[in-house]
Amino acid sequence: MTNEIRAIFDRIAPVYDQLNDWLSLGQHRIWKEMAIKWTGAKPGDTCLDLCCGSGDLALRLARRVGSTGQVYGVDFSANLLETAKQRAQAQYPQPHISWVEANVLDLPFEDNQFDAATMGYGLRNVTDIPRSLQELRRVLKPNAKAAILDFHRPNNQQFRTFQQWYLDSIVVPLADRLGVKEEYAYISPSLDRFPIGKEQVEIALQVGFTSATHYPIANGMMGVLIISK
């Protein structure tokens, strides 16, 4: 299963950013900045961005921690990491980011290493959510926070119907024109499988986080889980 998901993200790498704009109605940048603020990351911190994709969230984190800080962007898709590296190389001054190809279920870091962490649109796609949160907790310093941003199924039936219409009528046809229809058809079933907010809170507490709060945004079509070690 992990290899299948990795293959999907390797194939969609060239159009990943464009489709994220469509999936979020262009709002993902605002939500990413909100997530970073909630982590409490500050200049000089060492931060982690899991499932970093094309690097957008990691680059934003790097701006927050500045020249005295360090960010590690982790993803298991080599193609997406290459896109992230190219984006970083095009910036001046060069952001302090190390790109790491790894699985979030087995992070190549020491315990208690990071001051803050983010994960954008990744938790829904991991094969073992409790295990990924355990690993995240392991590498965070005591009292450190993480913000996990992702798409969700809204509780409200009207918004749920709109979300499904939007996916079927806008996103998947766009993906088809870009040559990745089959790859983006996975989104709807992944939303159906994804634990709702209160279930995410329960999982986070069960694996040892001292506090966990889930905030629905965009009428429940998006949410951010804030967890503290």
From Swiss-Prot:
Molecular function via GO: 2-phytyl-1,4-naphthoquinone methyltransferase activity
Keywords: Methyltransferase, S-adenosyl-L-methionine, Transferase
Pfam families linked to this entry: Ubie_methyltran (PF01209)
Reaction catalysis annotation: demethylphylloquinol + S-adenosyl-L-methionine = phylloquinol + S-adenosyl-L-homocysteine + H(+)
Keyword Transmembrane: no
Keyword Aminoacyl-tRNA synthetase among UniProt keywords: no
EC number(s) given by UniProt: 2.1.1.329
InterPro entries for the chain: MenG (IPR032904), SAM-dependent_MTases_sf (IPR029063), UbiE/COQ5_MeTrFase (IPR004033), UbiE/COQ5_MeTrFase_CS (IPR023576)
Pathway annotation from the record: Cofactor biosynthesis; phylloquinone biosynthesis
CDD domains, per database record: AdoMet_MTases (cd02440)
Function: Methyltransferase required for the conversion of 2-phytyl-1,4-beta-naphthoquinol to phylloquinol.
Family classification: Belongs to the class I-like SAM-binding methyltransferase superfamily. MenG/UbiE family.
Protein name: 2-phytyl-1,4-naphtoquinone methyltransferase
Organism of provenance: Trichormus variabilis (strain ATCC 29413 / PCC 7937) (Anabaena variabilis)
